[in-house]
């Protein structure tokens, strides 16, 4: 059979995937092993979709669509809907005739019209008996498989192939099905040839009939396609009258259509008629249908008798041969999935700076992997923490709808605004400032997580005495973006070298001064300008010299190097920043070889990050060393496990530590006394008994202990006594989430004379019922606040006073809320006014300084910077490396954030990113996404490029190779699957 193929826009609707968008492609008919399938190809590529047609067509409709064009609509038995538009009418008509033939089991009569009726009858006679058996088995098994929820369009191909095996029981049904075939062959044989000619002669009339009856058929299908009711009608004799009534209604409708059209109509019951053979739609078809339904019950029962055993095997076979992209799982089609991935972020109101930075950060594959794939306990992180909002948006950005994504963007903005108020409104902001704030805040959140994450023993190492099971999570900012530069100050007089190290997340580099005779300079030149040696006034402690030379070298390289190009200069006259539109060449590769030494550390490998994702135990000696060498607030990083480790971690301020610890223990004892006081109130005993705690302190033997042992004992006692109270205080705070693991809020609210070590300890004690401590804590606090004398009032008066105070607090809270709402409205109004004024000012600046900004294109104004001087060989080598990246420590361009506009106070930010998975460049302009060539990025952003992301060449090649291997494996699996189909 020569395959039929038509081209045009395609749309598919199914229960699993929903309705796809119109996509250019083609429908192709393929016949294999007596099974007819429809293969859908898309012009954009991807794995084709295959739909079974044999015994699976429900309706075929052809409608005109323009001049000499038609739209073909195909409905399958599971209500899947396929449409192809703008098809030439002749091709569409041929396809419709073929689908009608497949629908009515006249495939070979339609495809071989040259054969006579006798020849066709012989072919049908040899094939129908097997098909009738397959139809009975397929119909019965479809009812069973529908209960397992596996009704998919493409499932019928291997399904019928297994059940159609003669060795699986077709011999048993040969007798029952043979009777039906003998009765139905004459009508089909006699009608085959004239039916073919009739279809060719009356195309227009049949199209009109199909259009008029299409809606009526669609209304009846849901009621008719009820597998449960039909199964009961066949297996339960007491329910036969339901089937007879349904068949009678269908037959009456068919007879009426025969009288009106005079042609063979589309039979809505052909799916169910398959179990009784092909029906004779003549004038006496009504009685014949009823006798067939009632007389076929025994054979149907026999076929159902052996179905339960092979049915599970057939389902298993089905899953193996199914398209690999989703076994029995609802999935998004390739076309719509690709469209979702190419969706940007909505502009919330002058938030283009945020959208551009987020798109660039999300495109860093190693950064995203370190954030999402190391098992960070997100429930231990506060809901309003930036790292949690950031990761949530990263996970959902390609799979959620636009409204959900917009809400996630607002949460990210609010998380940053909570720390940096300048981003709280809707004013225009600088993209580099937002990037710096975002990276710093992410690092702080990771530090808090590692600091407060409670220790857990590593499986199999509980008995190791020298191991403290502390989980350390990798900070994505540190492993991917942070690098270290060593500044060496060299005295010119005596040669004394003083090294100083500094960590950076990005480099802010100056524009090189461009003189007219020279060609445009590149980012490589600006980077080399940053690292060039410079002189400065410096007083040498050794010789007293006043002049020194400073050299800058990389001490540790990053995976991704972020370069911020300073495109703004301050205008003293206008007191404004002017944008410099100077042209700067954007090379594909940068090299840092001239700024590295033999001791320069390479970037963290991808394997290193993966290993850090596992729970890695640290030895106690390593923990002590980290405590001692920590440059900032070492006391907050302590994790005490034993007296020995405590003694090692003590510093010179141990006496102050001891005083603070004793004060903390006394306060905790008082809190415990308040709890005891509440218990005594319930027993009508008023005194608050804290004497036992004091006696315990006195009898603890502190006098004979050293300071170290005394501190350890006090801390241990405080931990034992205060764990329930501190646990309740954490739960009672309204700003903390139930799934929060951070204790930073508690640390900030503690008095200065308290040691924050204890609050940062993990909660190892089982927490009591919060309800049992609510009244205790409130009563205790209320007693302290109002200074209620013990025993001076009765319990009833005290509770009444407490209720009155609580009502007063509620009223004050309502007033505070109302006032805050008014202040918020006033603030929003002020922001709107500021936005209007800023817009007017930007327009004025644009009109007044347009010529000035054009003039700034000629020269950056950096008089003292001038230009880098290279030898001819060095210049040629750098030029070659810009395209090949052959020099050591080369970095590859992967993203550019550009500012479109002539002034710094107005304009728009966009982002160009390289997608490693798609191996292509895309431009993200808020919600709009478009594909772009790398050469266009380099040429179009040479005057507007603001922030540049470069990835280390070895890291880039490794990620690219991994992605290519993954895609090759997927294509191989898809090819094997298509061959099996």
UniProtKB/Swiss-Prot annotation:
Motif KEN box 1 — list its residue ranges. 32-34
Q: Where is this motif: KEN box 3?
A: 784-786
Provide the gene name from the record: USP37
Q: Tell me the InterPro entries matching this sequence.
A: Papain-like_cys_pep_sf, Peptidase_C19, Peptidase_C19_UCH, UIM_dom, USP37-like_PH, USP37-like_PH_sf, USP_CS, USP_dom
Give compartment(s): Nucleus; Chromosome
Question: Chief location of this protein?
Answer: nucleus
- The UIM domain extends over 706-725, 808-827, 830-849
Q: Give me any GO biological process, just one.
A: proteolysis
Q: What is the lineage of its organism?
A: Eukaryota, Metazoa, Chordata, Craniata, Vertebrata
GO MF: cysteine-type deubiquitinase activity; cysteine-type endopeptidase activity; protein kinase binding
Instruction: List the biased-composition ranges (Polar residues).
Output: 135-148, 172-195, 266-300
Q: Where is this motif: D-box 1?
A: 71-79
Q: So what family is this one in?
A: Belongs to the peptidase C19 family.
Specify the protein name.
Ubiquitin carboxyl-terminal hydrolase 37
State which Enzyme Commission number(s) the record gives.
Answer: 3.4.19.12
Q: Which organism is it from?
A: Canis lupus familiaris
- Gene3D superfamilies documented for this protein: Cysteine proteinases, Ubiquitin carboxyl-terminal hydrolase 26/29/37, pleckstrin homology-like domain
Q: Which residues carry this modification: Phosphoserine?
A: 114, 170, 212, 630, 652, 654, 772
GO CC annotation: chromosome; cytosol; nucleus
Catalysis performed (reactions) = Thiol-dependent hydrolysis of ester, thioester, amide, peptide and isopeptide bonds formed by the C-terminal Gly of ubiquitin (a 76-residue protein attached to proteins as an intracellular targeting signal)
Q: Where is the composition biased (Basic and acidic residues)?
A: 149-159, 245-259, 683-697, 719-734, 776-788
Q: What does this protein do?
A: Deubiquitinase that plays a role in different processes including cell cycle regulation, DNA replication or DNA damage response. Antagonizes the anaphase-promoting complex (APC/C) during G1/S transition by mediating deubiquitination of cyclin-A (CCNA1 and CCNA2), thereby promoting S phase entry. Specifically mediates deubiquitination of 'Lys-11'-linked polyubiquitin chains, a specific ubiquitin-linkage type mediated by the APC/C complex.
Q: Where is this region: Disordered?
A: 111-308, 673-704, 719-831
**SMART domains with a match to the protein in the record:** UIM
Q: How is it modified after translation?
A: Polyubiquitinated via 'Lys-11'-linked ubiquitin by the APC(CDH1) complex during late mitosis, leading to its degradation. Able to mediate auto-deubiquitination.
Positions of the catalytic residues: 352, 908
Q: Where is this motif: KEN box 2?
A: 223-225
């Amino acid at each position: 059979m020569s395959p039929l193929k038509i081209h045009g826009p395609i749309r598919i609707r199914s229960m699993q995937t929903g309705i796809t968008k119109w996509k250019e492609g083609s429908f192709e008919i393929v016949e294999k092993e007596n099974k007819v399938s429809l293969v859908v190809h898309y012009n954009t590529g991807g794995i084709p979709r295959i739909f079974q047609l044999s015994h699976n067509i429900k309706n075929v409709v052809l409608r005109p669509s323009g001049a000499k064009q038609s739209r073909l609509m195909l409905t399958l038995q599971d209500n899947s809907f396929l449409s192809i538009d703008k098809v030439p009418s002749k091709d569409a008509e041929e396809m419709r005739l073929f689908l009608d033939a497949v629908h009515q089991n006249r495939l070979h009569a339609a495809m071989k019209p040259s054969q006579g009726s006798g020849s066709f009858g012989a072919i049908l006679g040899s094939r129908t008996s097997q098909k009738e058996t397959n139809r009975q088995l397929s119909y019965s098994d479809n009812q069973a498989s529908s209960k397992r929820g596996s009704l998919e369009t493409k499932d019928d191909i291997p399904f019928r192939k297994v059940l159609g095996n003669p060795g699986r029981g077709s011999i048993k049904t040969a007798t029952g099905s043979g009777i039906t075939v003998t009765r139905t062959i004459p009508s089909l044989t006699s009608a085959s040839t004239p039916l073919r000619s009739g279809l060719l002669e009356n195309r227009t009339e049949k199209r009109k009939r199909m259009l008029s009856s299409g809606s009526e058929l669609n209304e009846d299908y849901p009621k008719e396609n009820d597998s449960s009711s039909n199964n009961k009608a066949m297996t339960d004799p007491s329910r036969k009258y339901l089937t007879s009534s349904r068949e009678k209604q269908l037959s009456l409708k068919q007879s009426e259509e025969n009288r009106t059209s005079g042609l063979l109509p589309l039979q809505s019951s052909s799916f169910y008629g398959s179990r009784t053979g092909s029906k004779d739609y003549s004038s006496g078809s009504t009685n014949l249908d009823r006798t067939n339904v009632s007389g076929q019950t025994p054979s149907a029962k026999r076929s159902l008798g052996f179905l339960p055993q092979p049915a599970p095997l057939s389902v298993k076979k089905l899953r193996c041969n199914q398209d690999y992209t989703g076994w029995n799982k609802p999935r998004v089609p390739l076309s719509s999935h690709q469209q979702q991935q190419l969706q940007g972020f909505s502009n919330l109101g002058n938030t283009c700076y945020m959208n551009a930075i987020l798109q660039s950060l999300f495109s860093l594959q190693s950064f995203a992997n370190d954030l999402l794939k190391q098992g960070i306990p997100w429930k231990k992180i506060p809901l309003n923490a930036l790292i949690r909002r950031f990761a949530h948006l990263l996970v959902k950005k390609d799979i959620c709808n636009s409204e959900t994504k917009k809400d996630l963007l607002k949460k990210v903005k609010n998380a940053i605004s909570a720390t940096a108020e300048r981003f709280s409104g809707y004013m225009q902001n600088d993209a580099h400032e937002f990037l710096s704030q975002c990276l710093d805040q992410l690092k702080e959140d990771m530090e808090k997580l590692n600091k407060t994450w409670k220790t857990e023993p590593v499986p199999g190492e509980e008995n190791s005495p020298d191991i403290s099971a502390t989980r350390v999570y990798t900070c994505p900012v540190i492993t991917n973006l942070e690098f270290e530069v060593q500044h060496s100050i060299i005295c010119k007089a005596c040669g004394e070298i003083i090294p100083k190290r500094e960590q950076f997340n990005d480099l802010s580099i100056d524009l090189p001064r461009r003189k007219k005779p020279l060609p445009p300079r590149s980012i490589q030149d600006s980077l080399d300008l940053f690292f060039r040696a410079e002189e400065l006034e410096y007083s040498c402690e050794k010789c007293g010299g006043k002049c020194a030379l400073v050299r800058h070298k990389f001490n540790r390289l990053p995976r991704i190097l972020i370069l911020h190009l300073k495109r703004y200069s301050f205008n003293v006259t206008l007191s404004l920043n002017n944008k410099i539109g100077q042209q700067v060449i954007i090379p594909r590769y940068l090299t840092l070889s001239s700024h590295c030494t033999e001791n320069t550390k390479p970037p963290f490998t991808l394997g290193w990050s993966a290993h850090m994702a596992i729970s890695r135990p640290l030895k106690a000696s390593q923990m002590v060393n980290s405590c001692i060498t920590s440059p900032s607030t070492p006391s907050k990083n302590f994790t005490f496990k034993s007296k020995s480790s405590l003694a090692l971690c003590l510093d010179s301020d141990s006496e102050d530590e001891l005083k603070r610890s004793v004060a903390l223990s006394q306060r905790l004892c008082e809190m415990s006394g308040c709890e005891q006081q509440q218990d005594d109130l319930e027993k009508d005993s008023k005194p608050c008994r804290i004497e036992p705690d004091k006696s315990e302190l006195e009898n603890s033997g502190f006098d004979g202990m050293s300071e170290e042992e005394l501190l350890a004992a006090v801390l241990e006692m405080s931990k034992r006594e205060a764990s329930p109270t501190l646990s309740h205080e954490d739960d009672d705070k309204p700003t903390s989430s139930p799934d929060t693991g951070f204790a930073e809020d508690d640390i900030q609210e503690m008095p200065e004379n308290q040691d924050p070590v204890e609050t940062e300890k993990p909660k190892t004690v089982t927490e009591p019922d919060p309800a049992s401590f609510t009244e205790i804590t409130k009563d205790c606090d209320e007693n302290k606040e109002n200074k209620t004398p013990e025993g001076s009032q009765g319990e009833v008066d005290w509770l009444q006073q407490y209720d009155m105070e609580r009502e007063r607090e509620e009223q004050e809270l309502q007033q505070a809320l109302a006032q805050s709402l008014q202040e918020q409205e006033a603030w929003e109004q002020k922001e709107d006014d500021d936005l209007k004024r800023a817009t007017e000012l930007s327009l004025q600046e644009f009109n007044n300084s347009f010529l000035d900004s054009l003039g700034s294109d000629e020269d950056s104004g950096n008089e003292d910077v001038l230009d880098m001087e290279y030898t001819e060989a060095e210049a040629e080598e750098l030029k070659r490396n810009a395209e090949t990246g052959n020099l050591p420590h080369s970095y590859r361009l992967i993203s550019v954030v550009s500012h479109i506009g002539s002034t710094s106070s107005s304009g728009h930010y966009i982002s160009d990113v390289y997608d490693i998975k798609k191996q292509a460049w895309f431009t993200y302009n808020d919600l709009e996404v478009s594909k772009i060539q790398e050469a266009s990025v380099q040429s179009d952003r040479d005057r507007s490029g603001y922030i540049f992301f470069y990835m280390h060449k070895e890291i880039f090649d490794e990620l690219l190779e991994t992605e290519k291997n993954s895609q090759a494996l997927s294509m191989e699996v898809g090819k094997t699957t298509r061959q099996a189909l």
